[in-house]
Each structure stands twice: as C-alpha cells, then as structure tokens.
C-alpha cells in the first residue's frame, strides 16, 4: 500500500502548525515542499499501513467507523485507489472530521490518496462495519 497526502500551507498559516496537524493523523516517511499560488504545498508519503495507524486510531477513539466508512467508500475512484480528505483545523486538535464539500475547509483540507491492491480490505481495516456500536468484521491490515 502506498499513501500520498497533500496539504496546502497558505501564506497566512504557520508551516510548523500545518505539519503538526498532518503528523497528528499521519506518520510520513518523507515530506516534500512545492511552491504554489496560495503558498506552499506539502506532499507527504509512505508505504505500508503503519503510517495510517494514527488516523485509524482516531476514527476508533471517536467511534465514527460508520461515518468514516461511508465517506471513504465514496472516495473509491479506481480498483486500486481511494481518495478522501479531512479538515486541517480538526486534525491540528487530533480529531478526524471528513471533508465532503470542496469549500468545507476554509484553509484547505488534508487530502489522502491511498493505492492498494484491495480497496475493500483497506476499507474493512480502517473503518470496519459495525452493528449496534460493535465491530461486525475487522479485516487484517492491507498490503
């Protein structure tokens, strides 16, 4: 599994705070910076499910598996690709809040692109189905 995370650092934002927000929900192996019209774009990447453990833990801690599953499932864009976004300000506080509308996050979202050989297994691992508040089926981590 390969994960790429893209987040904008606007001219009015502190880059270290944006990196802190990113690292609250993701463990990158490397972070690249690119200049853009709005400031800087940070591109973080890693391989393996370990880098998404913070995001998964936050989803479980908040008890939002069903909501997360719904949003992430809508982000399946190809047989091997899932794209979803979370609110940058919420991530700074260590909370996961999914962004479903383009302008929902005024400072721009944190956008995840996950490439995996099995999108269903990824979905069942990061946000498993629940029944009456209990996990119905928990898949092993994807490749």
UniProtKB/Swiss-Prot annotation:
Q: Which Pfam families match?
A: RNA_binding
* Coiled-coil ranges from the UniProt annotation: none
The family note in this entry says: Belongs to the UPF0201 family.
PANTHER family for the chain = UPF0201 PROTEIN TK1335
Q: Which HAMAP family match?
A: UPF0201
Q: What is this protein called?
A: UPF0201 protein Pars_1985
Q: Which organism is it from?
A: Pyrobaculum arsenaticum (strain DSM 13514 / JCM 11321 / PZ6)
């Amino acid at each position: 599994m390969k994960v790429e995370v893209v987040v904008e650092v606007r001219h009015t934002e502190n880059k270290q705070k944006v990196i802190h927000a990113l690292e609250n929900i993701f463990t990158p192996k490397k972070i690249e910076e690119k200049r853009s019209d709005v400031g800087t774009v940070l591109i973080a990447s890693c391989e393996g499910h370990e880098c998404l453990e913070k995001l998964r833990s936050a989803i479980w801690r908040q008890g939002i598996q069903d909501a997360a599953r719904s949003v992430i499932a809508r982000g399946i864009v190809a047989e091997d690709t899932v794209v979803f976004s979370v609110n940058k300000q919420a991530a700074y506080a260590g909370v996961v809040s999914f962004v479903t509308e383009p302008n929902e996050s005024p400072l721009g979202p944190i956008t995840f692109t996950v490439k995996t050989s099995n999108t269903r297994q990824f979905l069942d691992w990061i946000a498993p189905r629940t029944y009456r508040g209990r996990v119905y089926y928990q898949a092993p981590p994807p490749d």
